[in-house]
Amino acid sequence: MAQTLNSYKMAEIMYKILEKKGELTLEDILAQFEISVPSAYNIQRALKAICERHPDECEVQYKNRKTTFKWIKQEQKEEQKQEQTQDNIAKIFDAQPANFEQTDQGFIKAKQ
């Protein structure tokens, strides 16, 4: 029971690291805590459970017997920033010229 609680606490730490880093693997868990492979698998299982409770924040991907944890919210924020930038660029290009005219003396004034 103590090992389970300890693994879960370590998984919570890895969850916070995942949020900052954006992606984690078993190797990251091993490097972070300098533990044995079986202990790292216990932490990985606990981290999977945490991700299952927060599907809008974390995603577990499996490829070639390798488990990767990905932080989803960060990707969504980057996509939203890109969309906002594209919208701003479109607004700039779609903007109508200001209602100004140049006077005989070279000054610019608003059209009336």
Curated annotation (Swiss-Prot):
Q: Secretion signal: which residues? A: none
The superkingdom of the source organism is: Viruses
Function text: Essential for virus function.
Give the protein name, as stated in the record.
Answer: Protein F-112
